[in-house]
Swiss-Prot record:
It is found in: Mitochondrion inner membrane. The keyword Manganese does not apply. It comes from Vampyressa thyone (Northern little yellow-eared bat). Core subunit of respiratory chain NADH dehydrogenase (Complex I) which is composed of 45 different subunits. The gene is MT-ND4L. Its main location: mitochondrion. One of its GO terms (cellular component) is respiratory chain complex I. This is NADH-ubiquinone oxidoreductase chain 4L. Keywords: Electron transport, Membrane, Mitochondrion, Mitochondrion inner membrane, NAD, Respiratory chain, Translocase, Transmembrane, Transmembrane helix, Transport, Ubiquinone. One of its GO terms (biological process) is ATP synthesis coupled electron transport.
Amino acid sequence: MSLTYMNMFMAFTISLLGLLMYRSHMMSSLLCLEGMMLSLFVMMTMVILNTHLTLASMIPIILLVFAACEAALGLSLLVMVSTTYGMDYVQNLNLLQC
């Protein structure tokens, strides 16, 4: 495994650990999700370029489209929760606490 692949795997792992550990604020969760999507995009692009898979060359673009949709939905949810409750805690999304 080359050093570049190992760096991308470590970036994904650190983002996943950040998502699991710092779950209190929604903004930090969204940033960790974006880090995971970015590392997946770079890893997928490197694999496709190294293996010369021309049929799979659209997959990273599709992943970027899903990442943009996820970011837009996450930010709109963040704005809605912060205007409704006045804070961006993830625990405000739990409907069982109401």
